[in-house]
Amino acid sequence: MAIVVFANFRIHERLIVAGNAAETARNIVAHERLFRIGIACGLIYCTGLVILLTALYVILKPVNRGLASLAAFWRLVYALMWVLMTLNLFEARRLLSGADYLRVFEADRLQTLARLYLGARFDQYYVGLLFYALASTVCSYLWLKSNYLPRALAVFGVISSVFCAACTFVFIIFPDFARVVNLWWFDSPMGIFEMALSFWLLFKGLRPSGIAEADGLSIRQRNPDLR
């Protein structure tokens, strides 16, 4: 998450000027290395998402294999949305590269097309966020069922994830909904849950669970040599 905050607020916000395609293009060309660092941050984040969904699947599979698989799939969709967002950055930079085959287009047209690719990231993010919130809802439910975490933390995860999914879905249909509920509030509660979960797992670890113990007992019963 920290790498995304860095890329968005220290790089993209500095280079991308709202409502000014020409200024945005000049910033990207003048600070190409910084722009490419932002691209690299996106790729690192995508890699982290895949590692995380794999780890969560392994942890939550004993609780309910089907739901754990569904959550992993939805998180994968979210990761793919981030891949598309990163590819859009590449395409925007290519349009501003000054290559010979682009000289048939006017400069302002190329700048507008580049800004279009950058703007498309907004839509892709919120489509991906819907799937991420759905995945988080399922994972939070599995945390609740597993007793791996304190019940209050798992319940907060379910509520915040459902809230994010509902807000995002309504926003996709009714864009003016952002005037009622600020876009920052869509995923902020869920982000707080994710951070609390991370700190809990880092410092406390997983609680012993009857589900995990039963799963281990079942394995030993099937494999007597492991006793």
Identify the role of each PLM range:
Residues 1-227:
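Hydrophobic, aromatic-enriched alpha-helical segments typical of multi-pass transmembrane helices
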